[in-house]
Amino acid sequence: MSWIERILNKSTITSARRANIPEGVWTKCDSCGQVLYRAELERNLEVCPKCDHHMRMTARARLHAFLDKGSESELGSELEPKDILKFRDSKKYKDRLAAAQKATDEKDALVVMKGELYGMPVVVASFEFAFIGGSMSSVVGARFVRAVEQALADDCPLVCFSASGGARMQEALMSLMQMAKTSAALARLRERRLPYISVLTDPTMGGVSASLAMLGDLNVAEPKALIGFAGPRVIEQTVREKLPAGFQRSEFLLEKGAIDLIVRRPEMRLRLASLLAKLTNRPQPQDPLPHEPRPDAVPEDHQDEV
């Protein structure tokens, strides 16, 4: 111990050390409260290495992690939302859009890309929950239809990662219409016998769960994802009964047959590639499953900062 450490108390030294740590280097798990190294968490696809809690992931990060590196090409980026109804609740809709676009650096709540998955051509859509709760707008519907049309043109499968609170109320019937519009587009994909895999992440609710999210040839979910139409509290107040433990979580839905499979995020890429290879009569991907995340993955030189 140095002479300065003998003079100063431990709390003063700890506070000084913390003050020198750049913001965003560390984060805390929403489930277990473990302090995690931000860069390591990103490498682990936002899955806590201690309790395996699947945190929310941005649409663009998910797409880049899922598709083969260098194969990605964005679709529908020119489509932008408009406040046709001049809607206003506690805030103008155009102001909500501007705030969401600034916060997420996205134009709307769905990002679509075409690319390759283990060398297989595929079109992938992913919801951005941070953009007004991933709500389904007319642009979201248009981009999803664009994804279907690209899959039809390329004669390839479609994968969609859902994370949404439902229809966007600020667009009224134009938003609700997207439920029918996206469902009709998927019917065209089914007629061509092209696979559609829907991946339900936390949360997938409302009009999205009642349309495109549950229409997959395979409906896959991440662990402990909240999936349903109305929230548990609303249902309890309506039926005036206590709901079962874990109601509307992916494990409960799998047990009741509402979904087909639960897949951990680090294993998602290979598992879906394997399923798509079977559905399209292609050779199975040969890469091994990603290694399990290590709970001691924090670099040694940062251990004293936890």
Swiss-Prot record:
Give the residue ranges for region: Disordered. Answer: 281-306
Which reaction is the catalytic activity of this chain? N(6)-carboxybiotinyl-L-lysyl-[protein] + acetyl-CoA = N(6)-biotinyl-L-lysyl-[protein] + malonyl-CoA
Residues in CoA carboxyltransferase N-terminal domain copies: 25-294
What does UniProt give as GO cellular component? Answer: acetate CoA-transferase complex
Q: Name one GO biological process term.
A: malonyl-CoA biosynthetic process
Check the record and name the Pfam families matching this protein. Carboxyl_trans, Zn_ribbon_ACC
Q: How does it assemble?
A: Acetyl-CoA carboxylase is a heterohexamer composed of biotin carboxyl carrier protein (AccB), biotin carboxylase (AccC) and two subunits each of ACCase subunit alpha (AccA) and ACCase subunit beta (AccD).
Name under which the protein is recorded: Acetyl-coenzyme A carboxylase carboxyl transferase subunit beta
Superkingdom of the source?
A: Bacteria
Main subcellular localisation: cytoplasm
Metabolic or biological pathway: Lipid metabolism; malonyl-CoA biosynthesis; malonyl-CoA from acetyl-CoA: step 1/1
Biased composition regions of type Basic and acidic residues, renumbered to the chain:
289-306
Gene expressing this chain: accD
> According to the UniProt entry, what is the EC number of this protein?
2.1.3.15
Quote the subcellular location field of this record: Cytoplasm
Species classification: Bacteria, Pseudomonadati, Pseudomonadota, Gammaproteobacteria, Enterobacterales
PANTHER family associated with the record? ACETYL-COENZYME A CARBOXYLASE CARBOXYL TRANSFERASE SUBUNIT BETA, CHLOROPLASTIC
Zinc finger region(s), C4-type: 29-51
